[in-house]
């Protein structure tokens, strides 16, 4: 007989977990799960859609403040189901949430994460007043000071590698 252990063990740092969850909320508000956001306006949920090669499988993982739910739609003969994550499994999750009701995620930004500006062209951290910069939450430790708008980036790929490399460290 299995008994759930209530004590959770943290395996990633709080900042990386929060940034991942924040990115997953953007899937609902702006990405492949935006139909879910439209169906539940004002609710904050996180999600990830998935589709395997040749439309064989439709996957969706969604969460609110109460539950994390994973849905798979596919065929047992490995033939294409003909559905994407958004057109298949997301629809089942959406129906489930309609029945159960949504309890919005509470996303309190953790210490060590702050809004920062990045160049869309290079990925380098730039001053917040740079035209065309993208503002996103970031784990600032190790990023260094932002560059001025006029500063050239010597190696744009390295700037992105630094940003992503520090994401989960």
Task: Name the predicted role of every residue range.
Residues 1-139, 145-146:
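A penicillin-recognizing enzyme superfamily signal
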Residues 108-112, 152, 169:
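Amphipathic repeat-derived elements
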Residues 136-138, 154-157:
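Secreted/processed peptides and extracellular or luminal domains of membrane proteins
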Residues 156-169:
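Short, low-complexity, Pro/Ser/Thr/Gly-rich segments in the mature regions of secreted, periplasmic
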């Amino acid at each position: 007989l299995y008994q759930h252990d209530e004590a959770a063990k943290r395996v990633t740092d709080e900042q990386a977990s929060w940034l991942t969850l924040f990115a997953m909320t953007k899937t609902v508000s702006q990405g492949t799960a935006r139909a879910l956001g439209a169906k539940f306006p004002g609710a904050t949920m996180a999600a990830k859609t998935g589709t395997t090669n040749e439309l064989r499988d439709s996957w969706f993982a969604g969460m609110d403040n109460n539950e994390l739910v994973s849905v798979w739609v596919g065929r047992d003969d490995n033939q294409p189901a003909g559905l994407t994550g958004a057109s298949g499994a997301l629809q089942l999750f959406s129906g489930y949430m309609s029945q159960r009701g949504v309890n919005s995620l509470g996303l309190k930004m953790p210490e060590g994460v702050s809004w920062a500006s990045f160049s869309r062209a290079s990925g380098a951290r730039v001053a917040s007043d740079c035209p065309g910069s993208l503002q996103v939450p970031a784990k600032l430790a190790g990023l260094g000071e932002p560059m001025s708008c006029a500063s050239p980036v010597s190696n744009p790929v390295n700037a992105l590698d630094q940003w992503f490399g520090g994401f989960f460290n």
